Amino acid sequence: MDQVKEFVTDRRFNPSNSNYGALYSPWINTRDQLAKDQNAKICLPPSGFIAGVYSRIDNVRGVWKAPAGTEAGILGHLGLTVDITEKDQGELNLAGVNAIRTFSGYRTVVWGSNTVSSDIEWRYGPIRRMANFLKSSIYDGIQWAIFEPNNEPLCGSIETDN
């Protein structure tokens, strides 16, 4: 936890510039696939595991669903490098870091969906992701009109999607 706090409070780290980024903690223990010893473990940053959660949630629910909560289980791991307590969770939330937690009698899950933006409009990941999805969908949907005359009939066609 101390390393996370140091990183977030480091003056070189400026989260207000990015509503596209997110931080997750802690690192995750898993099997070392490259080791000769099949029982060898390795500690990895959560990024690959988080990408898997994003992909699974997107496929099952859509980009509007936060990749967090009880559906956002971390798969293929052996444990976390640190057990995040409720108190730790509160501190991480204040710092804009999404916790990965193991709850008693349950599995390990992502328990936060914040971006590192200080802009309240972009604080939550699903908002940014939905905006990106809409922007991309609209852009793709009107490509047919790029070289059409910019006039009232074109605007009417775009509005009715003809």
Feature roles, as predicted:
Residues 1-161:
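Structured, hydrophobic secondary-structure cores that serve as assembly/anchoring elements
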